[in-house]
């Protein structure tokens, strides 16, 4: 699943540890052995098929602004669709499963630096707090450096098996709406 977005000053979701975080919410409908997440900024001329395009991306897709990506994969304590209410999501407990800053496996940014991010997380079935089970996850992203996060970004989430029913969105109300369809 590919998501194209635009991060800008003032539209962050949370300030945590002095950094402005933005979140993409991810519903995983089945047990997964592994998840991969990659993020790059800017999107530039990347060729992407069937991507989810946010309204902010559409409005700013020609922007040349980019940022040094830093990503986290976090799991909530919401394990079923019935628990995915606005109130529950807003007060959910989040456990960071993995994080990544700079990856040499990703394309360089326009400055020629390896400041794009890639992480792979393998489910740890022997530990219920680290297993990739059905439920609500989020991808947190910010910049490693202090300062504002601004620019287009491409986020891709994948698994080694087909997971029909995966939902990726920045908007919690859209997530709830899609879960209830």
Task: Identify the role of each PLM range.
Residues 1-16:
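N-terminal leader/pro-regions and domain N-caps
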Residues 9-11, 20, 76:
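A near-ubiquitous, low-amplitude feature marking generic local secondary-structure context
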Residues 13-15, 19, 58, 126:
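Short, well-ordered helical secondary-structure segments
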Residues 17, 30, 130-134:
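Surface-exposed coil/turn segments at beta-strand junctions on protein surfaces, enriched
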Residues 19-21, 28-36:
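Extended extracellular/luminal ectodomain segments enriched in beta-structured repeat modules
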Residues 24-25, 45-181:
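C-terminal edge strands of extracellular/lumenal beta-sandwich accessory domains
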Residues 33-43, 54-57:
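A short beta-strand element within beta-rich, extracytoplasmic domains
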